[in-house]
């Protein structure tokens, strides 16, 4: 299965296939507003503003899998992302990234780029970089600053 065959749901309930991003470099990240790592929203947004015009897309997937750090309804989460954090990149419906109900996207991401200690997502803000052909090229840890991805993003966009 290709990443482009996977359907995802937008914050508004509409669904689409990831094939709409063929030819783009993607950063896919599970996010949470109440996480202590939420300062990464600003850094991700800066990358998005800098490289979006060259073909970068950042896909945010709110996730409540870790310590109830993303409770609430997606309509409320969307407002916080937009108005508190100033996010302009795509925000999706809440998903599970581990376990029995994990989203197929995360099943694929973890299969192609397992972590250091197994395939489970350990925390919010685990970041995956996907190239223009749909290859999942690198997994970044939650504690990795999004700016650490910039060199790879530049290389892929050339």
Swiss-Prot record:
Keyword check for Cell membrane: no
Family, per entry: Belongs to the glutathione peroxidase family.
InterPro entries: Glutathione_peroxidase, Thioredoxin-like_sf
Name of this chain's protein: Glutathione peroxidase homolog BsaA
Residue numbers annotated as active site: 36
Gene Ontology MF terms in the entry: peroxidase activity
Lineage: Bacteria, Bacillati, Bacillota, Bacilli, Bacillales
BP terms from Gene Ontology: cellular response to oxidative stress
CDD domains named in the record: GSH_Peroxidase (cd00340)
EC code: 1.-.-.-
PANTHER family referenced in this protein's UniProt entry, alphabetically: GLUTATHIONE PEROXIDASE
Enzyme class of the recorded protein, top EC level: oxidoreductase
SUPFAM superfamilies (alphabetical): Thioredoxin-like (SSF52833)
Matches recorded under Pfam families: GSHPx
Keyword terms, alphabetized: Oxidoreductase, Peroxidase
């Amino acid at each position: 299965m290709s990443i482009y065959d996977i359907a995802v749901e937008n914050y508004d309930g509409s669904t689409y296939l990831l094939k709409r991003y063929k030819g783009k470099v993607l950063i896919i990240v599970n996010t949470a507003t109440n996480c202590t790592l939420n300062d990464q929203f600003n850094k991700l947004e800066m990358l998005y503003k800098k490289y979006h015009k060259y073909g970068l897309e950042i896909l945010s997937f709110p996730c409540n899998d870790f310590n109830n750090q993303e409770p609430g309804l997606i309509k409320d989460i969307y407002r916080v992302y937009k108005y508190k954090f100033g996010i302009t990149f795509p925000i999706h419906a809440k998903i599970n990234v581990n376990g029995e109900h994990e989203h197929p996207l995360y099943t694929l991401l973890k299969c192609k780029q397992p972590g250091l200690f197994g395939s489970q997502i350990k925390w919010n803000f685990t970041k995956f970089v996907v190239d223009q052909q749909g290859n999942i090229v690198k997994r970044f840890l939650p504690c990795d600053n999004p700016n650490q991805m910039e060199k790879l993003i530049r290389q892929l966009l050339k």
